């Protein structure tokens, strides 16, 4: 054990040179960056992501090729609203996507048409926040990565009912038709196109250019050619024919419709294949006029190729033309118009780049599998691919090759956010290109521009439906930072193009040896999704092809390379057959193994080998697990099933009022908080200039160069979130942990709160636990709690709920927010402001008015009395009804915030006033931009002083500052810096870098000013942006403080969960001999059968840590041993294993046996009794059965089911039973009569017929049975 204190923790890790964890959100952030490639200049962009989609869809031309629309570049402008604004107003955080398009005419007749270059708005793109989320309609969402079958070729095997082994090869492309080659029980090989159309493989070979039998047999080297003459033929008597002997002739006939003479080639089979040549065949062969015949080779081939001969026997075609026609008829069930169209259909299937795409991955996998050297740019199938696949399949039949394991991670790849968005954009752009083509054709003779051709809604509708409805776009789990980060690193096999729960078998769900270091074997949901949803391991990365890689250290001749160069990231395929040592294998300082036998891993085997045989070594013992599993101390002592529950339950831990980091951690807690980005962190080195509860200001250090190229001040302000609601109605309430004048370093965490303490993850509380039964109250995992825990708010959490009310214009008039509500007492509206919204600080009880609203009633003819009153008083107060938002039956809390958003509805005079304001805003913007440009020009003059231009060009490549000329202020004044190439302006590299940064910073600042201008104009002309049809929206936020109580669920980190059964007074709890009462009593019987001994290790080490004031880090599979525990309990003056005598709180007597008393980290989970408790007296009924609805959400009742009826029957309680089944449930008439009887105090009426019986009768009548009750 090393006694070094990392982050004030004693670390037990034995591994030397541990690898730094990668950024945990890299999988999401990098994918989105690669999708947009915003930091890459247009000319250097890779053909991937959005750029690839544009490149594939452009240029677009009309049908006559007169007009061409070309794509030059795309860019984005700053968002109109901040992320916080979007969350508050229910908007989508998006950026405008714009493309530079060029429209030109190729037709010389259109002389009046000039080439047009325009920036065209293509719609808003939801933009990923720095926390790797998307804000869609005010809610934070995550796009989960999908694990799906990699494109490529897969060889499989199945067994027919009669025991015959059948083999198949399936080619899966990114885009295009699937093709499968498969054998049948008659040893014939067929090709299946799109799993439907079946044809002999030789027919396909003919169609792709191997026209006759000779060509096909030569591929497999199966036949020899014999020249036809008597001498040669006599020599081959007794041998088998490999190909048919065909007589070919041309036949002419007259087409009746056209009168033309048409020639057709005819074939006649003289002798069939597989015929043994007899002497009498010689003359027939010579008479047929063939030049050569094919016969079987005498020496047998290494493999059995009889399947090819069998397939040829089944082949109905004799030439390429016949094969093409046959395939066309199979696919289309019709005859082709001509030979060319038939051939085109086959080419389009597999050889057309527009219709078929293997993708980089598919080509890579096919080349790898079949040992081909085809260029990676060839993304369609080739003849060579098809031949090699057939050859491999024949080897498979001859047991000379192996079938693929489809659960091997080399056959599964990850579709990350960027790829999923690219696919959606491809769909949107393909639709848009169709409409562009149509519009070009319609506007043939007009002068038009790119803007006239494009409809921006096309793309945004596809993108919006993806984020709103796709199974992989999910509402973010925001219970605590761990839940957030785990959700973003999740891998799902479900979703479009993936598996479905029902079809997924055991093999797909099971742990595979290739998951090691890539997908966590522990963290997966319990239930129907088990094994289909996994989590990425801590060190895993996803490469450009979408395969998951994990790091290893190279080992050469028994010596581990501990340098940076010795680190390699390998995919499952590259790791295949390598011998890999474990991460905790003891090493000498020079990297050699201490022991002469090393435990290692090779595929699914675990050999013990000599150090010289080892090829690689794990980088760390925790490499195998995900973040959540890595947070469980002593995981190595827990059963896997319980560890699974533990890692899942930590994600449900509710943020507490005061967070407390665990005494026994694993060392990953700090990294998790840093990478979750839920706290405020310093962006660089600097000094705290100002700090209070809501704001932190930092003055950052900047070099002279950074200062020179920047247009921003070095002082940056951060707002600290206070009582912000999360997706799960938890609270983000942060507090600063820094003081004015403190020096901060880059990445330093400056706040705490929201399950974080001192920069470390803090999900629960360290509590003193006794493992002993207590009066039966901890039977079956129940938990006994000390009242102190409740009183001192140790496990108290704050929950914030948002309630909103919308004001719309109805058919009968405008709704209105007001505190003046008809027929409501003054007492009920005392807390409402003039807009009818409850005041901040008001205590809410069930039934209280939160937001007052009146809505117009339907006009009905007034009675004479009403007419008289209206004539006298002239009021129309009776025309509105109360439509206020009231607190639900279980709602109690305090109003902590309120908001009102209004769309501006203006009269003529205020519109005129606004019109006068707009020019002022424009002038203000112009003056700010002029000042900004003045500063830019001044700085550019300094940078270019004495230097000569290397030629400055605009984005079209036209020179705007001539090569060889000197730079002048007038040159710079006339430049449009937003449309300029930033390549080398001078021959000084340093100056060029400075110029580039300066102009980029200028463009960024300019776009910010432009966005601010648009925002101001929008606020004046339209007001708050609200969803369609809504005029006002009021929101109130209610905070509820929840103490822990009986019925709440708690858990440790080892899957040891339970429900609080009793909160006991402090003086009645068992206490230690020094008088300390324990906080919590757990049942010791919950440990042995569950096999999660890790909790005992944790309790023992935790108590030693608490007594000594020390915190520990015990990494998984490399943590503290029993000897370490004993050493620390001895230091703390505690008995071994913390077996301590306790005294009974009631009598003060000592218990007979010592019990384990330790300090365990306990979590309060999101399953709280307050959310689940529910009672109904009257409420809604189901429309059809007329029975009460079920569930708390519907304000439903409990179902009195079949078994409960038996119970009442057993007691003979016939009247109660009759009541329950009729008037208390679905006897509609009886219900209302019973109500009348109760009100009037009369005896109960006789029950009628239950509605469910009527439903049954209607059902039977619907089946045509006439049933009447008598």
Curated annotation (Swiss-Prot):
Enzyme type, top EC level: transferase
An annotated GO cellular component: DNA-directed RNA polymerase complex
Keyword Ligase recorded: no
SUPFAM superfamilies for this protein: beta and beta-prime subunits of DNA dependent RNA-polymerase (SSF64484)
InterPro entries for this protein: DNA-dir_RNA_pol_bsu_ext_1_sf, DNA-dir_RNA_pol_bsu_external_1, DNA-dir_RNA_pol_su2, DNA-dir_RNAP_su2_dom, DNA-dir_RNAP_su2_hyb_sf, RNA_pol_bsu_bac, RNA_pol_bsu_CS, RNA_pol_bsu_protrusion
Keywords: DNA-directed RNA polymerase, Nucleotidyltransferase, Transcription, Transferase
Reaction catalysed by this enzyme: RNA(n) + a ribonucleoside 5'-triphosphate = RNA(n+1) + diphosphate
Secretion signal, residue range per the UniProt entry: none
CDD domains: RNA_pol_B_RPB2
Biological-process GO terms, alphabetical: DNA-templated transcription
EC number: 2.7.7.6
One Pfam family of this chain: RNA_pol_Rpb2_1
GO molecular function: DNA binding; DNA-directed RNA polymerase activity; ribonucleoside binding
Function: DNA-dependent RNA polymerase catalyzes the transcription of DNA into RNA using the four ribonucleoside triphosphates as substrates.
Subunit structure: The RNAP catalytic core consists of 2 alpha, 1 beta, 1 beta' and 1 omega subunit. When a sigma factor is associated with the core the holoenzyme is formed, which can initiate transcription.
Family: Belongs to the RNA polymerase beta chain family.
NCBIfam families: PRK00405.1, rpoB
Protein name: DNA-directed RNA polymerase subunit beta
Gene (name only): rpoB
């Amino acid at each position: 054990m090393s006694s070094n204190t990392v982050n004030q923790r004693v670390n037990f890790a034995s591994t030397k040179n541990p690898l730094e964890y990668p950024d945990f959100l890299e999988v999401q952030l990098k994918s989105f960056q690669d999708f947009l490639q915003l930091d890459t200049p247009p000319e250097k962009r890779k053909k991937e992501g959005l750029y690839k989609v544009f490149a594939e869809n452009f240029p677009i031309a009309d049908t006559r090729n007169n007009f061409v629309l070309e794509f030059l570049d795309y860019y984005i402008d700053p968002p109109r609203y901040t992320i916080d604004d979007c969350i508050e107003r229910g908007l989508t955080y998006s950026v405008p996507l714009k493309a530079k398009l060029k429209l030109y005419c190729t037709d010389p007749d259109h002389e009046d048409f000039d080439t047009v270059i325009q920036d065209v708005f293509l719609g808003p793109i939801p933009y990923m926040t720095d926390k790797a989320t998307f804000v869609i309609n005010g809610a934070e969402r995550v796009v989960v990565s999908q694990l799906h079958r990699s494109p490529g070729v897969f060889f499989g095997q199945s067994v027919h009912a009669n025991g015959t082994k059948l083999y198949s090869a399936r080619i899966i492309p990114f885009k295009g038709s699937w093709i499968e080659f498969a054998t049948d029980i008659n040893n014939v090989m067929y090709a299946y196109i799109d799993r439907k159309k079946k044809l002999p493989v030789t027919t396909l070979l003919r169609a792709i250019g191997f026209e006759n039998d000779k060509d096909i047999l030569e591929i497999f080297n199966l036949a020899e050619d014999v020249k036809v003459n008597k001498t040669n033929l006599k020599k081959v008597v007794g041998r088998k024919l490999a190909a048919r002997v065909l007589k070919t002739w041309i036949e002419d006939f007259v087409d009746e419709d056209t009168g033309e003479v048409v020639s057709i080639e005819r074939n006649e089979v003289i002798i069939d294949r597989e015929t043994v040549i007899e002497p009498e065949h010689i003359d027939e062969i010579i008479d047929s006029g063939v030049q050569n015949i094919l016969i079987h080779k005498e020496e047998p081939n290494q493999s059995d190729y009889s399947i090819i001969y069998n397939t040829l026997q089944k082949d109905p075609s004799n030439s390429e033309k016949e094969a093409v026609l046959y395939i066309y008829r199979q696919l289309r069930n019709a005859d082709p118009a001509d030979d060319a169209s038939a051939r085109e259909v086959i080419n389009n299937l597999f050889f057309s780049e527009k219709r078929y795409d293997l993708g980089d991955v598919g080509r890579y996998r096919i080349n790898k599998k079949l040992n081909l050297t085809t260029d990676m740019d060839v993304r369609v199938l080739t003849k060579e691919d098809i031949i090699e696949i057939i050859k491999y399949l024949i080897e498979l039949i001859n047991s000379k090759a192996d079938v693929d394991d489809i659960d091997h991670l080399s056959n599964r790849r990850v579709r990350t956010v960027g790829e999923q968005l690219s696919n959606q954009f491809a769909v949107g752009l393909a639709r848009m290109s169709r409409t562009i083509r149509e519009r070009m054709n319609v506007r043939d003779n007009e002068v038009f521009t790119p803007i006239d051709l494009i409809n921006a809604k096309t793309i945004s509708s596809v993108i919006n439906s993806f984020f709103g409805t796709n199974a992989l776009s999910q509402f973010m789990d925001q219970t605590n930072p761990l839940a957030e980060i785990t959700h973003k690193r999740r891998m799902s096999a479900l979703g479009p193009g993936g598996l479905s729960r029902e079809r997924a078998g055991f093999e797909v769900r099971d742990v595979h040896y290739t998951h090691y270091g890539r997908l966590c074997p522990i963290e997966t949901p319990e239930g129907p999704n088990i094994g289909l949803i996994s989590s990425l391991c801590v060190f895993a990365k996803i490469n450009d092809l979408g395969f998951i890689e994990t790091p290893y250290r190279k080992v050469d001749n028994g010596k581990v390379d501990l340098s940076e160069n010795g680190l390699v990231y390998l995919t499952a395929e590259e790791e295949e057959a390598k011998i890999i040592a474990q991460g905790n294998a003891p090493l000498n300082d020079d990297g050699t193994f201490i022991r002469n036998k090393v435990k290692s891993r090779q595929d699914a085997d675990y050999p013990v080998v000599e150090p010289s045989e080892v090829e690689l070594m794990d980088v760390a013992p925790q490499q195998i697990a995900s973040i959540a599993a890595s947070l469980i101390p002593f995981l190595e002592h827990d059963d896997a099933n319980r560890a699974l529950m533990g890692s899942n339950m930590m994600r449900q831990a509710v943020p507490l009022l005061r967070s407390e980091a665990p005494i026994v951690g694993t060392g990953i807690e700090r990294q998790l908080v840093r990478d979750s980005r839920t706290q405020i962190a310093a962006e660089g080195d600097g000094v705290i200039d100002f700090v209070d509860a809501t704001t932190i200001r930092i003055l950052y250090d900047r070099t002279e160069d950074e200062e020179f190229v920047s247009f921003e001040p070095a002082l940056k302000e951060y707002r600290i979130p206070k009582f912000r609601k999360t997706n799960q109605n938890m609270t983000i309430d942060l507090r600063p942990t820094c003081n004015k004048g403190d020096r901060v370093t880059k990445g330093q965490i400056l706040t705490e709160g929201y399950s974080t303490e001192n920069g470390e993850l803090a999900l629960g509380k360290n509590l003193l636990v006794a493992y002993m039964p207590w009066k039966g109250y901890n039977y079956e995992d129940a938990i006994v709690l000390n009242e102190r825990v409740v009183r001192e708010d140790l496990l108290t959490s704050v929950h914030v709920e948002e309630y909103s009310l919308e004001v719309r214009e109805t058919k009968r008039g405008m709704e209105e927010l007001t505190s003046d509500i008809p027929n409501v007492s003054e007492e009920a509206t005392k807390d409402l402001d003039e807009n009818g919204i409850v005041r901040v600080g008001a205590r809410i009880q069930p039934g209280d008015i939160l937001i007052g609203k009146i809505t117009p009633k339907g006009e009905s003819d007034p009675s004479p009395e009403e007419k008289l009153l209206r004539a006298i008083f002239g009021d129309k107060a009776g025309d509105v009804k109360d439509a206020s938002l009231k607190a639900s039956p279980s709602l109690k809390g305090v109003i902590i915030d309120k908001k009102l958003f209004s769309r501006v509805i203006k009269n003529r005079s205020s519109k005129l006033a606004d019109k006068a304001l707009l020019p002022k805003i424009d002038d203000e913007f112009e003056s700010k931009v002029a000042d900004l440009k003045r500063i830019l020009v001044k700085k550019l003059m300094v940078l270019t002083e004495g230097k000569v231009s290397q030629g400055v060009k605009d984005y079209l490549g036209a020179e705007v500052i001539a090569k060889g000329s000197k730079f002048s202020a007038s040159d710079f004044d006339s430049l449009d810096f937003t449309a300029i190439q930033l390549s080398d302006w001078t021959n000084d590299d340093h100056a060029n870098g400075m110029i580039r940064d300066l102009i980029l910073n200028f463009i960024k600042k300019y776009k910010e000013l432009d966005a601010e201008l648009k925002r101001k104009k929008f606020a004046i002309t339209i007001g708050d942006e609200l969803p369609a049809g809504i005029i006002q929206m009021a929101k109130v936020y209610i905070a509820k403080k929840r103490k822990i109580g009986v019925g709440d669920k708690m858990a440790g980190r080892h899957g040891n969960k339970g429900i609080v059964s009793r909160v006991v007074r402090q003086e009645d709890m068992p206490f230690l001999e020094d008088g300390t009462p324990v906080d919590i009593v757990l049942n010791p019987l919950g440990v042995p059968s569950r096999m999660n001994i890790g909790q005992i290790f944790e309790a023992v080490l935790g108590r030693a840590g608490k007594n000594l004031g020390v915190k520990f880090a015990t990494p998984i599979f490399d943590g503290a041993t029993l000897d370490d525990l004993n050493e620390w309990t001895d230091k703390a003056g505690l008995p071994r294993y913390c077996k301590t005598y306790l005294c009974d709180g009631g009598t003060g007597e000592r218990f007979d046996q010592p019990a384990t008393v330790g300090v365990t980290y306990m979590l309060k989970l999101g399953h709280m009794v307050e959310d689940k408790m529910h009672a109904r007296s009257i409420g809604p009924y189901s429309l059809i059965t007329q029975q009460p609805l079920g569930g708390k959400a519907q304000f439903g009742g409990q179902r009195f089911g079949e078994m409960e009826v038996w119970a009442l029957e057993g007691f003979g309680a016939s009247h109660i039973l009759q009541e329950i089944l009729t008037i208390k449930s679905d006897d509609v008439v009886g219900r209302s009569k019973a109500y009348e009887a109760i009100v009037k105090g009369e005896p109960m009426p006789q029950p009628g017929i239950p509605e469910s019986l009527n439903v049954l009768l209607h059902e039977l009548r619907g089946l045509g049975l006439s049933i009447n009750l008598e």
